């Protein structure tokens, strides 16, 4: 089990921030425009302290029928993951989805979304939901291209953190 858990831990230390979305709610519909940064920057997501927490978190998924982890392997290397749980609102909540940087653009993220859809339908859920930040332009565009729609924007979720300029964007894919 521990080897599987270690396979699950993908170190996505740095994420390139090239721009952000500017969501707009009008006539009961969310739209967004893109703003590209003149100077992209790197954001760190995980440090060494998180490894132990991540292993413990993964163990919660074993033999839990309301949670699942899918790992994507290529050439015997774990290059992608998605963590899902059954949410109270009859959606499958994507807690984490990641593809190693060198393997992006090869359809792995789409494959992880597709297996998530299959799991949610098998659980008789009504769709997928997830949260990301407005300044994760690459992820926002990916979710939009997969058919997700913005359901809400939370301006206070990250207010007590160092990067308190970020807004939480909640995305939904209904079926």
What are the language-model segments listed below?
Residues 7-91, 95, 100-101, 113-114, ...:
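Acetyl-CoA-dependent GNAT
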Residues 15, 72, 104, 110-111, ...:
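Preference for well-ordered, secondary-structure-rich cores of eukaryotic proteins
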């Amino acid at each position: 089990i521990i080897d599987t858990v270690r396979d699950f831990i993908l170190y996505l230390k740095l994420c390139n921030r090239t721009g952000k979305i500017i969501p707009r709610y009008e006539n009961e519909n969310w739209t967004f425009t893109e703003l590209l940064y003149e100077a992209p920057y790197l954001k760190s997501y995980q440090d060494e302290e998180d490894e132990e927490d991540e292993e413990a978190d993964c163990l919660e998924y074993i033999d839990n029928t309301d949670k699942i982890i899918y790992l994507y392997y290529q050439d015997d290397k774990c290059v992608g993951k998605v963590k899902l749980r059954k949410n109270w609102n009859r959606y499958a909540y994507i807690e984490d989805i990641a593809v190693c940087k060198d393997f992006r653009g090869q359809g792995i993220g789409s494959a992880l979304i597709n297996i998530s859809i299959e799991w949610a339908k098998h659980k008789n859920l009504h769709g997928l939901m997830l949260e990301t930040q407005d300044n994760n332009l690459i992820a926002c565009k990916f979710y939009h291209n997969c058919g997700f729609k913005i359901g809400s924007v939370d301006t206070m979720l990250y207010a007590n953190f160092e990067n308190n300029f970020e807004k939480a964007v909640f995305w939904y894919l209904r079926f």
